[in-house]
């Protein structure tokens, strides 16, 4: 836990979140959690979260285009319903992740220094 908090010092207020010093954070993560050494493939948390967000947006756009295709008559009702259910599941996942991030932030702000 302490080493994870110390890794926050790798972030600079003048750099973007995506510009994390990945060498230090990846090497310290590999030393503190040896079971996840294979999982550290150079991706930062910000890039993974950004990828998930872009996938969610693409899923929602796909569902919207499928609904327009259903209105035009070029897609079946089943295809439209499937894409809408997938978009709803993606949205619920994004909301759940957002709620977890907000609750974690609130817990960090409540910590005494």
From Swiss-Prot:
One of its GO terms (molecular function) is structural molecule activity. GO terms for biological process: bacterial-type flagellum-dependent cell motility. Coiled coil: none annotated. It holds the Pfam family FliE. Disulfide bonds: none annotated. It is found in: Bacterial flagellum basal body. Keywords: Bacterial flagellum. GO terms for cellular component: bacterial-type flagellum basal body. InterPro entries: FliE. Belongs to the FliE family. This is Flagellar hook-basal body complex protein FliE. The lineage of its organism: Bacteria, Pseudomonadati, Pseudomonadota, Alphaproteobacteria, Hyphomicrobiales. The gene is fliE.
